[in-house]
């Protein structure tokens, strides 16, 4: 018999039903469950797949560069970044009639094009790229790196080049390599690029390989470095009248601590950014030499963890046993990595708009909105994944004997207290926030807006004041003009910071009021509820009072039959499944808030947000309904316009989202009966019955149907909001 899919599971390959296909796809990446898997092969497969991942990333970025160079308008955008619309690529569509061709021909293009809302133009411009040739060179280089990555992945699966398990479990060497080799060296290289190419580029000096060694980024070269006069590198920074990309108003400094933004580009000073990367490089290069490898000096992670026993016995045996637990569990390591990456991605979202690093990106409002929303959604998925793999760790890898009375065991011992406290916090936030919104809503409906309960966020305003925001009149710390910190800030450190906080042309420390207070608590409710579901799923993954032997059933199981009464929907997978809905819900509130506040800020009618955000109808009418007008105007009696594609995507997103409910609010028997009826009809229909299939069609399992439903719900939800966001923002601001 020929080998059937899936080859990694002979048991599944012999399944006579369509379950073979779906279960095969579902477990393709669960290497641990495959036939003939060994620990060594498991590590090697994962290691090789990392190279494939890198190859895809480099190919994708290469494609961005290539298509902009080939079909974009980078060179004309560089001449006038504020008024030329950046083109991502052309659109070739045989269905386009003349109105469509006219609607999508913009940005100085000859035919229909897509506008870039990803910020790549601003990024490439800031780092010193100026011509299409530069973009082609970058694309070719990344293509080369992509090919090298593929070869690397293949190579590390060959017998001679397969690393051993001990190599994968050498934590100290890996830490040193990642800290120094990846973070340290790459940050140093980036600081070097900024100093040698980007900063001269911002001052009108075009540095390439042919003149790289002739152009000194600083007049005195390395002199100040070797004579210890490092402060010279910060002297004579660009002036406030500097025109980016020209020598007009340019200085000579390369490493500064100015703070604030370049007045023309409204982005961080390039010299500040270079300084930051140099500092990061220094820290990580040092950190990468701290762990004990060949020479018997430095820290041993195991020794560090074994020594971490808090005095007073409050945390039992502290970190004892953690080293082997973490080092031998890929799921634990992945959970930690995902948790860190998720937090970082959310921080990227917050900082890309409040402290924009790329020239002119702050004035490209649609790009700002798209990047914020994109990074928050990515962060949500990554963070929920962290808890999913934490739960799998508890089911597959956790050994109670190895972890007796350490912090992990104590988390499990205290899980009732942890879960009930989170539950209490969620209930408190939910009822109080909704209560305030509903009360205010009713007051507005009855025509007595003055009876709303409006709470000023005085503590948050005080924190903003402490950082230098003067408009609240708190007169504290950095907002107190006669305090020592304020005076030192004028000259010693970040003199531009206080100006930036107090001018209205950026998104630093936006003025907040009762509407912000309410929506912050709504978001807090979402965060706490999502966390509650995820934490409970992980802590109850091994067992609960209702089902003490849960771990024997694995990560995802539908029920344990009627005999156990009520064991449905309590697998760790079900907790993840439920949490994703809450995560999407929460990020919906976060992005609604961010977008509405910024739209009113950019349009100069902040009072609309302030007045309408304190009650539910305000959000529904003045944010969602008012801003969706562009989406229902994509096609009208006058034909179509450049928003038509978003209008179509808005409808399509709703369709995909609604399809999700077909899988979510349904039972397996219904589908099985329907499938059998269809199969019966098929087999009795002339011509149709000439086509036979090998596998008996069966309905999806309960867990699979939930996954399919969740996938449609998530994709439709994000498509719908993406279309709304881009159309409503670009419709107003271009």
Curated annotation (Swiss-Prot):
Sequence positions that bind chlorophyll a B1: 654
Q: Give the record's cofactor note, including how many are bound.
A: P700 is a chlorophyll a/chlorophyll a' dimer, A0 is one or more chlorophyll a, A1 is one or both phylloquinones and FX is a shared 4Fe-4S iron-sulfur center.
Q: Is DNA-binding tagged as a keyword? A: no
| Superkingdom | Eukaryota
Q: Which InterPro entries match?
A: PSI_PsaA/B, PSI_PsaA/B_CS, PSI_PsaA/B_sf, PSI_PsaB
Q: Can you state the subunit structure given in the record? A: The PsaA/B heterodimer binds the P700 chlorophyll special pair and subsequent electron acceptors. PSI consists of a core antenna complex that captures photons, and an electron transfer chain that converts photonic excitation into a charge separation. The eukaryotic PSI reaction center is composed of at least 11 subunits.
Keyword Iron-sulfur applies: yes
What are this entry's molecular-function GO terms? 4 iron, 4 sulfur cluster binding; chlorophyll binding; electron transfer activity; magnesium ion binding; oxidoreductase activity
Q: Which family does it belong to?
A: Belongs to the PsaA/PsaB family.
Q: What is this protein called?
A: Photosystem I P700 chlorophyll a apoprotein A2
Q: Which organism is it from?
A: Nymphaea alba (White water-lily)
The record describes its membrane topology as: Multi-pass membrane protein
Which residues does chlorophyll a B3 bind? 662, 670
Species classification: Eukaryota, Viridiplantae, Streptophyta, Embryophyta, Tracheophyta
Gene Ontology CC terms, in alphabetical order: chloroplast thylakoid membrane; photosystem I
GO terms classed as biological process:
photosynthesis
